[in-house]
């Protein structure tokens, strides 16, 4: 069983990300996004982490374009959460 890794274009930059139906939010690490951000706390595996929340970020996944909220902060892997997957109409059935 392999993790569903996809290449996504986020704010014009290409990144590898993990499709995660267990995650509510989309979280990336080491990426610079334009515009204003606001601080947010999210619960992760190791407790709560402070992240930067960017709104209205263009994201392209496998040719599908969506505009959504992206969180930037420390994460073990770049994660596409349910918030964007529902916009894509993407379901993962295991």
Where are these regions (language model features)?
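Aspartic protease
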Residues: 9-94
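Charged, flexible boundary elements
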Residues: 1-8
């Amino acid at each position: 069983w392999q993790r569903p890794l996809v290449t996504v274009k986020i704010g014009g930059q290409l990144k590898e990300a993990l499709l995660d139906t267990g995650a509510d939010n989309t979280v990336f690490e080491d990426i610079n996004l334009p515009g204003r951000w606001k601080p947010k706390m999210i619960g992760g595996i190791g407790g709560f982490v402070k992240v930067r929340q960017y709104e209205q970020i263009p994201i392209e996944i496998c040719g599908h374009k969506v505009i959504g909220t992206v969180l930037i902060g420390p994460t073990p892997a770049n994660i596409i959460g349910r918030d964007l997957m529902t916009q894509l109409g993407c379901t993962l059935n295991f």
